[in-house]
Amino acid sequence: MRAARSLRIACACALAGLAGLAQAIEFRSVAAPSLLYDTPSDKGRRVLIAAPGTPVEVVVTLDKWIKVRDASGAITWIAQDGLSARRTLQVTAERAVVRSQPDEASPAVFEVVKNVILELAAPAADGWVQVRHAEGGTGYLRIGEVWGL
């Protein structure tokens, strides 16, 4: 009886410890055209200029610099003030149909091609995500067709 109770307590403690290790992935978007660097310094090598709205995954935050990963998997550094909390997604499919409802059988609202940036309109659910195009169209895409979730 004591052994079973001790085992349950040990398992509960182990699971609680593992839960603390799990971290939510944080995404942001580029606020304005911003230089991305290979080091956390404006004296580093300039890698590229990121367009406004580009979604990035936050990897590490150091003082005024944030290490980010883009849809291609490239890791670079950006000044903290170059990012916005606004959530955007980047289309990864060659062509994707945005539908009126989260269902393959629902009518198409519009189509997008690879690398188009869309605003996240609502959290993903059941394999679909609601998106908004800069020109105003809103609809649903399969989560496998975008990056930034």
What are these regions (language model features)?
Residues 1-11:
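Bacterial N-terminal signal peptides that target proteins for export
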Residues 10-20:
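Bacterial N-terminal signal peptides
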Residues 21-39, 46-52, 57-102, 107-117, ...:
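SH3-family beta-barrel domains
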